[in-house]
Amino acid sequence: MNRSEIEEKVKHFLIEELEIDEDKIYPEARLKEDMNIDSLDFVDIVVIVDKYFGFKLKAEEMAGIDTLAQFCDYIESKVN
């Protein structure tokens, strides 16, 4: 799966599953501050990532991820 496909899937689940406004979804967007993703959303993200990408997110690995670009980097490192 290439980077573009990962970004499209992430964008899709942020809009469809978490109901985040499309205008808040851009590479430098901060997950908590700009997209208002809270701890309950992170629980949903664990399930969604498993569904879309086939692996389980680990909380300790997510701790250093602040932006959407970093999140996509993390997913890319796991699926490729």
What are the residue ranges of the model-derived segments?
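Phosphopantetheine-dependent thiolation modules in NRPS/PKS and related acyl-activating systems
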Residues: 2-37, 41, 45-46, 51-80
